[in-house]
Amino acid sequence: MAYRDQPLGELALSIPRASALFRQYDMDYCCGGKQTLARAAARHDVDIDIIEAQLAQLAEQPIEKDWRAVPLADIIDHIVVRYHDRHREQLPELILQATKVERVHADKPNVPRGLTKYLTALHEELSSHMMKEEQILFPMIKQGMGRQATGPISVMESEHDEAGELVDVIKHVTKNVTPPPEACTTWKAMYNGINEMIDDLMEHISLENNVLFPRALAGE
């Protein structure tokens, strides 16, 4: 099956572990979920035939859960517990680790300078964002008022883009979250945590941008 003309967001939802494959190629399937596979492959200089073959292999496996068929209230409850609560745990710990690494290894050429600042900015951005979703947007959707939520959804999508831009800066500062040979245990653990946080955030944004918001706006 040809996947090249399909949007990344749709592929991430319909093919098991496609999201992990896109992350491997640094393809944005959440905020950039509307771009086709062909366009994303061209932007990242990826052989379209190779990634299509990889997707075909993944597609042979049964999908764990098709969120496109799950009631919106259940999706919202899942987002809050699986992603919002998790981000609230992840980011303060990562900020503490980054503060320590930047202080202890200040003289190392590969130290991720500015990482604490950017993680703090992401934490503040997401804290405000998630609170607005939980207090304003999610209750509207649960009450069947999704069609009236065009404004709040537009704001949330814009804030998703801003969070994505901060993640890009964090990836740049950390050399794509790759620890240097001299990295200590804390440094390596922090990078593992950052990778996990980015994976979670991309899944989180994809579920909202590509499933929850379109279905809410359609009046479900």
From Swiss-Prot:
Domain of life according to the entry: Bacteria
MF terms (GO), sorted A to Z: iron ion binding; nitrite reductase activity
Cysteine pairs bridged by disulfides in the record: none
One of the GO biological process terms: response to oxidative stress
Cellular component annotations (GO), alphabetically ordered: cytosol
Keyword Transferase: no
Compartments, as annotated in UniProt: Cytoplasm
Keywords: Cytoplasm, Iron, Metal-binding, Stress response
Record's function text: Di-iron-containing protein involved in the repair of iron-sulfur clusters damaged by oxidative and nitrosative stress conditions.
Family: Belongs to the RIC family. YtfE subfamily.
PANTHER family hit by this protein: IRON-SULFUR CLUSTER REPAIR PROTEIN YTFE
Assembly mode: Homodimer.
Protein name as it appears in the record: Iron-sulfur cluster repair protein YtfE
Organism of this sequence: Salmonella typhimurium (strain LT2 / SGSC1412 / ATCC 700720)
Gene name of the encoded protein: ytfE
